[in-house]
Amino acid sequence: MASSHTPMMQQYLRIKTDYPDMLLFYRMGDFYELFFDDAKRASQLLDLTLTHRGQSADKPIPMAGVPYHAVENYLARLLKKGESVAICEQIGDPATSKGPVERQVTRIITPGTVTDEALLDARKDNILLAIHTQKQKIGIAWVDLGGGRFHLQELTEEHQLNAELVRLQPAELLCKESTPLPSFCSNFAVKFRPGWEFDASNAHKLLCEQFSVTDLSAFGEQNYPTALIAAGALLAYLKTTQKQSLPHLTTLTLEQSEDYLQLDASTQKHLELFENIHGGGEHCLLSILDKTACAMGSRLLKRWLGKPLKQHAIIQTRQQAIKEIIFLQQDVSLHQLIKQCADVERIVSRIALKSARPRDLVSLLQTLTLLPAIHDELQENKSLLINEIKKEISPLPLLQQLLETAIIDNPPMLIRDGGVIAPGFDEELDELRNLSSNAHETLVKLEQEEKNRTGLSTLKLGYNSVQGFYIELSKAQAQNAPPHFHRKQTLKNVERYITPELKLFEDKVLSAQSKALAREKWLYDNLLEEIQQYIPELSDLAKSLAQLDVLVTLAERAQSLNWNCPNLVPESGIMIQAGRHPVIEPLLQERFIANDLELKPNQNMLLITGPNMGGKSTYMRQTALIVLLAHIGSFVPADKVTLGPLDRIFTRIGASDDLSSGRSTFMVEMTETAQILRQATSQSLVLIDEIGRGTSTYDGMALAYASCAFLASTIKAYTLFSTHYLELTELPKEFSCIRNVHLQASIKTGQIVFLYRVEEGCANRSYGLEVAELAGIPKEVLKLAHEHLNQIQDTQSILVQTQIIKPPTSPVLTELKKIDPDRLTAKEALDLIYKLKHLECAESIN
């Protein structure tokens, strides 16, 4: 460290050494300052003015800063950009410090570990995820620090990892340094960690410490060896960043893929579950469903959508709860109560991390006071799931009483501002406050005594945070100030003084205020520790309130959107009567055209033809969305639905170049198709909307034919296969399990009219030129296209006729077919040659 640096800069550099990969916010008075490369980076990311302070190696030291009172806004912007920040505060007293004020890092904020309410999206989980690969296994562990959830999963394929990342959308990824990562990981904030953190024995030790056990066998860890190493690395990172215990992480959830309806990354995007094709949050399935009353419910609903269940029994308990809520007309009253509840899940995490603010505790208290009313509202609902929820929504009278006596009704935002602990809670604090609060009365008394003693009519006693207490005299009377008045400050029209008596009073009052703040901070920290004993009950309460919110929301959606309860059965098949698209229907001004669908083991594929914009993709997507909604326990947009067992939903709908990994549209299309053909089973729902478009017509048709045939006859998956290759409509003649259906359209007064009805049979034309006209293609181009189309159709007609008119059979060929060459003698062979020659001559004469 350069000796030429000032003591303050030496202190900065010493602290910065421990946080090389983070932006160090170094508190200096009313600002957080950044220096050197941190300053340059922050100025770019936050659009700050880059200035300089002092020199290093004969060059000015770059500096940038942000006001401490506005720091949360700047932190939020940095976290969204994937940056991590170390907050370095002044912990020493500037008045007593001989050198630089003592400072230390008091808080580390990273994208995946942030729990501050102001820095989080209330309706999204904030996930920290670690990846470890070993022996062709991919282990992942993720934690939602704000929700107290800790999950493990073992994967075998990269596409499974991609699906999980798309579903979870982690704010931060941890992986072992020098580990090659798939290209799709570049969409996330990746932190490379030292190799020793990814160690099996270290992971076992950290996990045992976290869960206070000597053995992990109760968690089933033997089946998750790779994921456990990732979990250990994740805990090591949390230990570094949080610098304290994590009492709200009490168990591991082991994800098992066989429990869920699998949705790969492409399917999640194609079905627009969480965002539309443009990346926005509107006009997607979640936007239609999410009418939840609280943030906890919103986050849980998104988790349900991302992980649809396979087990019919669990789904049916959700259905029964929703039916009861509808029957008892409880949705409105319950939502009004839940809307008043705080985000208990995240408040609990802040209590566990000792970062809960006073208003968090007031919000928690308000929620506790609502529990009896919510519990009473649920009394008539006898469904199994609601009965379980009722058990967790029981009042917590001791905690409620503690909060009522400890915190005032409307506290300031921060404990450092004081005035948080309620009067009567602590006798010592009350005494210190009384001393401070009586200061005004004492000040008035002192002022009157000095006026009487000195006879100075303009004499006033005052106080400000800079000068402290003072006696003020006008300029005219200042010359008459008595000797015990010691001048403190000279202003334009007045002089200010201090007296020994006033100084003694000042020390006493300021000492009382300082002691009161210190006492209040100590009491508040103890209060948080006392509340921590209720973390298990509060965590269960948060889960139950969230679950109740989602069930009430699904009940409201079912009634508002005219959805019905699907029937889940053990027999194979998919039957939908009058199905509608859950996202498009609510957005339409006119009536949505409903359509039926039936797939069963011996008739498992629909080959769908019809014009572009005719509704093929809508029909396919609505089928998948109805199936997905049924598997989260929701009612569905259809008159009647019966579903047998299903394991996955696959989609191959639309495609575009994947420039980041250098893949063309056709390559993307083929990759998605390959995954379907390799992974689909007879219990999978497969949606394929056009394949083979990115190559030559014949290659494309061949690929479409082979894929269609393989899905129908070999895999036997439930398949909706749309195509513009009308030649494929001959497939039902070859495979009885395939049915032709088409979307109707007609031409009226020269314009195409889409009817959006699904009918049996195949389309007789594609209406491509009519759709092109709707799109605004110039008339001269359309005219040329029509002429060229007629030429092509005429040529194809001639070719077909040529193929159909078979030439007459040749007598020579007929005779040759009768012969077995291996049995002819030399004489017979010679006679045959003469005979064939004779036949050939006779044929030429004819």
Swiss-Prot record:
Gene Ontology cellular component annotations, sorted alphabetically: cytosol
Free-text function comment from the UniProt entry: This protein is involved in the repair of mismatches in DNA. It is possible that it carries out the mismatch recognition step. This protein has a weak ATPase activity.
Keyword DNA-binding set for record: yes
Binding annotation for ATP: 610-617
Keywords per UniProt: ATP-binding, DNA damage, DNA repair, DNA-binding, Nucleotide-binding
InterPro entries, A to Z: DNA_mismatch_repair_MutS, DNA_mismatch_repair_MutS-lik_N, DNA_mismatch_repair_MutS/MSH, DNA_mismatch_repair_MutS_C, DNA_mismatch_repair_MutS_clamp, DNA_mismatch_repair_MutS_core, DNA_mismatch_repair_MutS_N, DNA_mismatch_repair_MutS_sf
Stated name of the protein: DNA mismatch repair protein MutS
Entry-linked CDD domains: ABC_MutS1
Biological processes, Gene Ontology terms: mismatch repair
Lineage of producing organism: Bacteria, Pseudomonadati, Pseudomonadota, Gammaproteobacteria, Legionellales
Cystine crosslinks: none
Family: Belongs to the DNA mismatch repair MutS family.
Alphabetical list of Pfam families matching this protein: MutS_I (PF01624), MutS_II (PF05188), MutS_III (PF05192), MutS_IV (PF05190), MutS_V (PF00488)
PROSITE patterns: DNA_MISMATCH_REPAIR_2
NCBIfam families xref list: mutS1 (TIGR01070), PRK05399.1 (NF003810)
A GO MF label: ATP binding
